[in-house]
């Protein structure tokens, strides 16, 4: 994924290259003559560069594709440290002590010196962050198959046309296939495991618990694994539920895992949530248990075919609004080899055009996957983050990065994806009014260079970026 997750808007902003004589835009993409697909012949070596991202706006997953142990790292967009917490003086970034003359002193310095080093200004107006927090991984869903032996015919791919990732290979004379998608209509991540021989599927299903969740507990019952607890940092309540349905064979609790034995096919659904609510000043809502349970119950009651069909129909309702024709032709090279060959003169022009079209439509795919109504907007990493403390907190930089996420929304006919951004801006007004009054003695509202889901509208102490009181107008 590299930093496509940070700047995917730039990809789609170049939807119609200027001056290319064969560029054409179509709004009817029911039957694509050239399929859009990322594909590789080996498992992902690392999360950022090679993992395959799936998402439904609120949740995201990254598929690794290892033969013996499949890993799906997953996120839920409201799982954030920081914000209000018992014993924490969280002021939304507003000054923790009155500074009645700070603005006047800063203005005098600028008037007197014209060019002022940012350090003294930061000392007057900035302060260290308290409770800013970070977006965090929810954990990993792992499928442990044991040693299947040497694999052949290995393919790992992401079907951009239908928003489905897959892994297929042959081992021990058995052809295995796994499919993965994130369903917006059903609110779950879905995994399907099949084999071409009856009773060939036996594996353990487990979920990891990252650090900073000392009271998290696993509960297993029937074919369901529940992980619930609170973040140590702020007490945020979280819960995920995994439901495993085996066709043929059996599934049963086995210590801390669910064990599938002798199955023909297996469907796994995963939902997650927290008690976060975008409401100032507490930013808390109901315990997620009832909501997560209802979501998993409803999805588990459906067949895999029903879940898959609903997902594809929902996704293509958005994605199929735009088709880009640059005269491209489908190359036979895996995507990593295609990237390496691009611009070297070894590809035909039509094959290079294919990569350009794929790159553009991948940007639209990432926006659809990371921003849908009903959750927070896409952050610095969309909806995908591997760690518990991510670069820049995977926050919302409102100087330009947040806006960049949504550059493709209107111009590539994905206006609905911007609704979370509009609602997020509206929610910033309440804490922003307090910042305007306490810091400037002014009406209206303000937000500075960056913010988080907890209404951080004040300042920090990085001299190069702490002061940007007109950011709300820039939004």
Protein language model annotation of sequence segments:
Residues 401, 468-475:
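Extended, hydrophobic alpha-helical segments in both membrane/secreted and soluble proteins
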Residues 25-463:
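Aromatic-residue-lined binding/catalytic grooves and analogous aromatic/hydrophobic interfacial grooves
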Residues 3, 260-262, 472:
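Short, surface-exposed loop and linker segments with low hydrophobicity and enrichment for Pro/Ser/Thr
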Residues 1-24:
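Secretory targeting and sorting signals
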């Amino acid at each position: 994924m590299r930093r496509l997750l940070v700047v995917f808007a730039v990809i789609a902003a170049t939807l119609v290259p200027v001056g290319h004589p064969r560029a054409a835009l179509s709004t009817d993409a029911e039957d694509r003559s050239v399929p859009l697909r990322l594909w590789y012949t080996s498992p992902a070596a690392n999360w950022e560069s090679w993992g395959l991202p799936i998402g439904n706006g609120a949740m995201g997953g990254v598929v690794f594709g290892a033969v013996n142990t499949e890993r799906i790292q997953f996120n839920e967009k409201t799982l954030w440290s920081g914000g209000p917490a018992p014993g924490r003086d969280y002021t939304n970034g507003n000054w923790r002590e009155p500074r009645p003359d700070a603005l006047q002193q800063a203005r005098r310095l600028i008037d007197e010196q014209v060019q002022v080093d940012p350090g003294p200004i930061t000392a007057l107006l900035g302060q260290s962050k308290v409770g800013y927090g970070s977006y965090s991984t929810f954990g990993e869903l792992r499928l442990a198959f044991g040693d299947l032996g040497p694999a052949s015919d290995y393919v790992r791919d992401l079907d951009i046309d239908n928003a489905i990732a897959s892994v297929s290979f042959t081992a021990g004379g058995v052809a295995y296939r796994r499919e993965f998608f994130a369903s917006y209509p059903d609110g779950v991540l879905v995994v399907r495991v099949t084999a071409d021989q009856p009773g060939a599927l036996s594996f353990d299903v487990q979920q990891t618990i990252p650090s900073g969740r000392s009271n998290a507990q696993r509960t297993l019952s029937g074919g369901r694994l529940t992980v619930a607890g609170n973040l140590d940092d702020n007490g945020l309540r979280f819960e995920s539920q995994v439901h495993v349905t085996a066709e043929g064979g059996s599934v049963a609790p086995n210590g801390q895992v669910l064990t599938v034995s002798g199955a023909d096919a297996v469907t796994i659904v995963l939902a997650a949530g927290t008690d976060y609510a975008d409401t100032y000043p507490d930013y808390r809502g109901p315990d997620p248990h009832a909501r997560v349970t209802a979501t998993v119950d409803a999805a588990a009651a459906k067949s895999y075919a029903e879940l898959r069909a609903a997902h594809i129909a929902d996704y293509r309702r958005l994605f199929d609004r735009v088709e880009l024709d640059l005269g491209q032709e489908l190359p036979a090279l895996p995507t990593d080899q295609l990237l390496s060959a691009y611009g070297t003169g070894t590809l035909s022009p039509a094959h290079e055009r294919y990569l350009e079209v794929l790159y553009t439509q991948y940007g639209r795919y990432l926006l659809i996957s990371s921003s849908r109504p009903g959750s927070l907007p896409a952050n610095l990493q969309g909806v995908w983050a591997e760690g518990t403390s991510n670069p820049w907190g995977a926050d919302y930089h409102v100087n330009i990065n947040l806006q960049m996420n949504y550059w493709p929304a209107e111009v590539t006919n994905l206006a609905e994806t911007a609704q979370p951004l509009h609602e997020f801006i509206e929610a910033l007004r309440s804490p922003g009014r307090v910042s305007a009054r306490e810091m400037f003695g002014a009406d209206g509202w303000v937000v500075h260079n960056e913010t988080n889901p907890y209404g951080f509208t004040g300042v920090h102490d990085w001299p190069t970026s702490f002061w940007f009181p007109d950011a709300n107008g820039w939004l």
